[in-house]
Amino acid sequence: MKLIYLGAEVGSNRGLLEGMGIKTMGISYSRIVKRGEPKTKLWLVSERFEDDALVVASPGISETDGMTVGELEDFAKAYREFIFNNESRLSGVIEFAPPALGPEWTVAQRELYADLDERFWPVWNPDFGFRNLVDLTNDYQEIAVPGAEVLSNTAHQISGHMRSATARNGTLFHGLGVSSPESLIQTPLATASTLSWTQGMRNGETIVWDGTRLVRYPARMKDQARPRYKSVIEQAGLDYDAILADDNKEVTRLAIWSYQQLEKDMDKKKPGNHPFTVIEGGGDVTNSDDFEMELSGNTDVDVTNRRSSVERLGNPPPEPRKA
């Protein structure tokens, strides 16, 4: 399984990730816009990321209520221009398909991204039914599925369709907004994106891999939690004293290192195991709103010739589009 570390549009975040050897990162177009970037020049992945970085772009808009049709269309146009300006350096592009603009608009927009081939990931709308999901698997190698559906009462049906499509066409699936570790294991999704690695510097959480699972402690428990993992922290090559002193950068490095261990461990897990725990006053919570799934799916079916576009990022980037 491959984790996609979100928030890499922020330079300081990107620096921490690169310093820990992270290569697979996610950027949000809406967050770039909200940060007021760029002001006088194009925002280019090639100028901000290392050459071997694996970058996935998403619209970054989860709630479109309140936006008019015109505002949605304007955002879609701006997002499309952003993607084409960065096309040669993107591994994956998550579709912007607000239901308010309707299925005909969505289909027409997909044609505009045809040159991206497997790097364009259409989003299945459950309102269109399973027949539509099957149709998408016949047309696209990689498909995004809303996380709410992965966790719904029909999750077993969706999972069945996913497995069938993977066996039939080598289709890879991308779960959007899945927060349940159980779903990470039981659903045929192979990569997940998360912003949770920033919780230490944002909210004072302690995120640590204890050797068998990822454990998250709220800020109020950091003084009692961090000393428990002194040997783990030191063996990871991190500065225990800095973490004890609540140094934001070192606490964040601990979180990144811990997610790296989770990523390795998830490949070994089978349904029923829980490699992720949030400690809230001593209780285990197996769901976390901060753990987001946005990316692709894989199963034990041999799809050697149908590699995810994230995996392909290690190859030379495609030639830039001709004007």
Predicted regions and their residues:
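Transmembrane alpha-helices
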Residues: 252-256
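Glycine-rich phosphate-binding active-site loops on the catalytic face of alpha/beta enzymes
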Residues: 148-149, 179-213, 277-290, 320
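Eukaryote-skewed repeat-based solenoidal scaffolds used as protein-protein interaction platforms
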Residues: 58-59, 68, 72-201
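Non-catalytic, usually N-terminal nucleic-acid engagement modules in DNA/RNA processing proteins
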Residues: 1-109, 114, 208, 238-246, ...
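A conserved mid-domain beta-alpha-beta active-site/ligand-binding segment of alpha/beta enzyme cores
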Residues: 210-250
